[in-house]
């Protein structure tokens, strides 16, 4: 467990110097608060030994190697980024020798000893925005949350460093070693303590062990030797245990009570490990979740995969005290099948009678590489191996040397002579195990896949659909499963929970919530309905016209679907044009050129033909819109089309799938017309409060709202860059139109590198640029005013990255503003938006139809800022959308920085109201639109990476050209968006 270095006088601090606003707008006095001061740029105080250049250009924090949600795998849910003690502890003193009582400040990652009383570090004093109070707006109600109150231990917890020799990389082997050590020595040398272990370097006890350092000898059975009946091989290990630090429970108690702002994060992490200890032994751990085929019957996902059900578990500090967050989870696992059966499922064909093609071999190799198998051809031995590859030759042709004289023997002969095993399917290749220098061959029919291996590669569309069916649970069913899980885990009988003095409630937390009112939406005066009040998060376009409908005079259509005849395509385009007209646009019924049919593999040729032919027809006037009809399964076609249109030709495009062309739905056409209008630069609707200037801390002075996100490559793409996207509102006071910019950056880099940048120009000298600066300039061009307030919604940041993201990106915002004019420092509010969390809110009474929507979920607008939220910081949960199926996931908003002095009601209402302005549908959405748009833009930009190999599901895959290596700063930039594309919401 990481131990933090104590702060000394040379530590870097964040210092914000404020200065009074020289010019006030009287409207800035909102919510009973004075106008916020306009701060000067962030200044970083550094030790005297740091040079001026180092101080002015701090290098960004190191990249986070973890993965994101739909953007990757697990991230840290709690705590700050911290350093682990050296894996090689200093040689312990002899038992008779005492340590000096003087204070010694160690180097980073080492231990600070103060009179033998070693205390665990706390989170960096980040000075995140404190909670300004609790919200009062809305209709009060009670909801239940999947949080279970946990008692705080009364004893201080002790941490010990564990060194196992020889070193072991496997957590499961480490755990087996420590389990055997506890079995042997608990009653004697361990003083009857039952320690909890993290599987790596740290051991924890409630109370001290009878020593500060001790070495033990342990022998454990080698499970991988595979012997079933008979003596098993034993391995011997030395285990050194050394006292490291103590976690102060009183400090944690004060933090939970709101009396201290600094969280003793290691103490929380220890308690998390304690409550996981028994589950680690019972189930298959994956990140913070646990899975088992015994919880529910596994469901087949196809191609040799199955779903396992499980549960997520995490201890969290909240206002009500320590809270155990329990949620249901599902994951894809490799079915424990005979390898031949797995291969047949993977390929979807009989492999025993039909020969394998080269593409079959590639697919088998990808599917089995890294998978653990056990042999079945030996009666009493089930030895396990990890697959390294596949032989290029069939089994019948495989020969290998059996002695130093290179005497060759066939694999068939070897297995017959050694094991009496006759290989039946000699046309199949063998599995290759071991390393390349000393490879071993195993016939497929002699191997079975080991149970409990999680599948970490990308799922195809069918597998995703099948997995979603398993995970999609109605709220009442999910709540019942969570309660059953808590009862099954029986924390009251958990020996580790008892040892550490932790009692867990078996009741869901009952939480006070409020339902915020939906905002009034403004539509065009020419419509029958000029404004609208959404009902339960929904409304429609009947009798309404877009508030700013655009004109489409010059358009064309390309048909890439063989099954769509020209007359069908023409009829669809007519229907779509009429819907645009009904919705408030002007749409020319005739295309510039007749509908052009093309093959999907000739997308570039077709698009350029349509572009140039149209230009000739219109005498140089460019197309305003390109409609494209695509096959339902279109592979790379969609991405190629978007890349060519947006980065080469400067065309705004709208794609439609064949199934929608044949089965025309009014609802579908209405939604497509909404997308077309904003892509053309229009607005569909705006908040009534926005145009009447009644939004606190937005309507009073020119305000720009940003959204930012970073998406990472899928598993297995170890060299593809991450994509960052930033969008910003371009209209005020409406705050509805958002321009977007994208950039590629180093693999898995979470901090957005291009927010602000400078470079040297031979003529102009130092030149400033970056996405923030460019969007501030475009706001001024669009509105005629410079922004005097910034609201920044940042998506996709885990709690462990809060500090470094705020430090780095707030500094970039400051520098971007200062580069535009001296002393230009508008106040900033920086809010992190999180959807990848496991808090779920349930109606207090599922039978009360007035407290739920049609899906059984809590009502849209439900906000919670008490009990399950942070003890002192400014955060809240908001369920802003109506559920469709499954259990709604509320978004979690954490205000890290607030120079605009928002009240709780102010930021909660603004966020909820913005969720009704999402351009692509007539529903409120689950996260604030600027963050949503940034995610869409980042996802779109991944198609710009060329050349790409598209996977079966149409998502960008690995590059087939030389790519940037991990950590390389020289990432190849994305092709630039054309200027006319940048100005509009092209990503919608």
Curated annotation (Swiss-Prot):
Question: What ranges does the record list as Low complexity composition bias?
Answer: 41-57
Q: Where is the PAZ domain?
A: 338-451
Which key words tag this protein in UniProt?
A: Cytoplasm, Developmental protein, Repressor, Ribonucleoprotein, RNA-binding, RNA-mediated gene silencing, Transcription, Transcription regulation, Translation regulation
Tissue spec. comment: Expressed in roots, stems, leaves, developing embryo, siliques, inflorescences, provascular tissue, shoot apical meristem (SAM) and adaxial (upper) sides of lateral organ primordia. Observed in the floral meristem, the adaxial side of sepal primordia, and the provascular tissue.
GO-annotated molecular function: miRNA binding
Which subcellular locations apply to this protein? Cytoplasm
Q: How does it assemble?
A: Interacts with GATA18/HAN and KNAT1/BP. Interacts with RICE1 and RICE2 that act as cofactors.
- Protein's UniProt name: Protein argonaute 10
Q: Give the gene symbol.
A: AGO10
């Amino acid at each position: 467990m990481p131990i933090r270095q104590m702060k000394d006088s040379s530590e870097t601090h964040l210092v914000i110097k404020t200065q009074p606003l020289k010019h006030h707008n009287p409207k800035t006095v909102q919510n009973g608060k004075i106008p916020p001061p306009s701060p000067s740029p962030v200044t970083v105080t550094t030790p005297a030994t740091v040079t001026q250049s180092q101080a002015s250009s701090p290098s960004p924090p190191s990249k986070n190697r973890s993965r994101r949600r739909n953007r990757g795998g697990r991230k840290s849910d709690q705590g700050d980024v911290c350093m682990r003690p050296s894996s090689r502890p200093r040689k312990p003193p002899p038992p008779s020798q005492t340590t000096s009582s003087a204070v010694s400040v160690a180097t980073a990652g080492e231990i600070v000893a103060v009179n033998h009383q070693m205390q665990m570090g706390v989170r960096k004093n980040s000075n995140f925005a404190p909670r300004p109070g609790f919200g009062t707006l809305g209709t009060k109600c009670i909801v239940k949350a999947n949080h279970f109150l946990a008692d705080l231990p009364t004893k201080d917890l002790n941490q010990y460093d564990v060194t196992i020799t020889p070193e072991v990389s496997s957590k499961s082997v480490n755990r087996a070693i420590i389990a055997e050590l506890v079995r042997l020595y608990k009653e004697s040398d361990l003083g009857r303590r039952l320690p909890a272990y993290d599987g790596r370097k740290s051991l924890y006890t409630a109370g001290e062990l009878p020593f500060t350092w001790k070495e033990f000898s342990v022998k454990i059975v080698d499970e991988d030797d595979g012997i079933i009946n008979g003596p098993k091989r034993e391995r011997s290990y030395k285990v050194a245990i050394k006292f490291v630090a103590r976690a102060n429970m009183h400090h944690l108690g004060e933090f939970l009570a709101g009396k201290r702002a600094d969280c003793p994060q290691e103490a929380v992490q220890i308690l998390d490990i304690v409550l996981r200890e028994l589950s680690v032994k019972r189930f298959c751990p994956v990140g913070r979740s646990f899975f088992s085929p015994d919880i529910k019957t596994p469901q087949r996902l196809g191609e040799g995969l199955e779903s396992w059900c499980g549960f997520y578990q995490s201890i969290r500090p909240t206002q009500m005290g320590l809270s155990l967050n329990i949620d249901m989870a599902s994951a894809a696992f490799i079915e424990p099948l005979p390898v031949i059966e797995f291969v047949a499922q993977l390929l979807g064909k009989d492999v025993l009678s039909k020969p394998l093609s080269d593409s079959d071999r590639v697919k088998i190799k990808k599917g089995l590489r890294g998978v653990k198998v056990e042999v079945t051809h030996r009666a009493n031995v089930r030895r396990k191996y990890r697959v390294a590859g596949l032989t290029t030759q069939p089994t019948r042709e495989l020969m290998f040397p059996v002695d130093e004289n290179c005497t060759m023997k066939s694999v068939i002969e070897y297995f017959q002579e050694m094991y009496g095993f006759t290989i039946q399917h000699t046309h199949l290749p063998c599995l290759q195990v071991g390393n390349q220098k000393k490879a071993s061959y195993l016939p497929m029919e002699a191997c079975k896949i080991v149970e409990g291996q999680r599948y970490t590669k990308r799922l195809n569309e069918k597998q995703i659909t099948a997995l979603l069916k398993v995970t999609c649970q109605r709220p009442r069913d999910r709540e019942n499963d969570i309660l059953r899980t808590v009862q099954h885990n029986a924390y009251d009988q958990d020996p580790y929970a008892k040892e550490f003095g932790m009692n867990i409630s078996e009741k869901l937390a009952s939480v006070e919530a409020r339902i915020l009112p939906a905002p009034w939406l403004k539509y065009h005066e020419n419509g029958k309905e000029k404004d609208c009040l959404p009902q339960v998060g929904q409304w429609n376009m009947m009798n309404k016209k877009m508030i700013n409908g655009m004109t489409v005079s010059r358009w064309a259509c390309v048909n890439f679907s063989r099954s769509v005849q020209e007359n069908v395509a023409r009829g669809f385009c007519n229907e779509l044009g009429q819907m645009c007209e009904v919705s408030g646009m002007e749409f020319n019924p005739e295309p510039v050129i007749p509908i052009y049919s093309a093959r999907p593999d000739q997308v570039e040729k077709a698009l350029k033909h349509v572009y140039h032919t149209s230009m000739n027809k219109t005498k140089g006037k460019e197309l305003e819109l390109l409609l494209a009809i695509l096959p339902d399964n279109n592979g790379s076609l969609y991405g190629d089309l978007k890349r060519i249109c947006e980065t080469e030709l400067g065309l705004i495009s709208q794609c439609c799938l064949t199934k929608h062309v044949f089965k025309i739905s009014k609802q579908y056409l209405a939604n497509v017309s909404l997308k077309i209008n904003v892509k053309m630069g229009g607005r569909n609707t705006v908040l009534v409060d926005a145009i009447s200037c009644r939004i606190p801390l937005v309507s009073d002075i020119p305000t720009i709202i940003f959204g930012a996100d970073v998406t990472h490559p899928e598993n297995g793409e170890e060299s593809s860059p991450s994509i960052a996207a930033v969008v910003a509102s371009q209209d005020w006071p409406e705050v509805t139109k958002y321009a977007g910019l994208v950039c590629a950056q180093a693999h898995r880099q979470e901090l957005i590198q291009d927010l602000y940048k400078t470079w040297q120009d031979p003529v102009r000298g130092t030149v400033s640029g970056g996405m923030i600066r460019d969007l501030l300039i475009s706001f001024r061009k669009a509105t005629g005013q410079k922004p005097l307030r910034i609201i920044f919604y940042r998506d996709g940041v885990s709690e462990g990255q809060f500090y470094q993201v705020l430090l780095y990106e707030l500094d970039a915002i400051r520098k971007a503003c200062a580069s535009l004019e001296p002393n230009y420092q508008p106040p900033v509010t920086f809010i992190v938006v999180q959807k990848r969390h496991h808090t779920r809110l349930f109606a207090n009474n599922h039978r009360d139809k007035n407290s739920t929507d049609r899906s059984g979920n809590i009502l849209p607008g439900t906000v919670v800022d008490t009990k399950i939220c942070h003890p002192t910081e400014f955060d809240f949960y908001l369920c802003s959308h109506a559920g469709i199926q499954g259990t709604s996931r509320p978004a979690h908003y954490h205000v890290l920085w607030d120079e605009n002095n928002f009240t709780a009601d102010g930021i909660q209402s603004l966020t909820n109201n913005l969720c009704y302005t999402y351009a692509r549908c007539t529903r409120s959405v689950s996260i604030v639109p600027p963050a949503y748009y940034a995610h869409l833009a980042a996802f779109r930009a991944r198609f710009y990476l060329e050349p790409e190999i598209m996977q079966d599901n149409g998502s960008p895959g690995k590059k087939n050209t030389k790519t940037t290596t991990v950590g390389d700063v020289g990432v190849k930039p994305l092709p630039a968006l054309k200027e006319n594309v940048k100005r509009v919401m092209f990503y919608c």
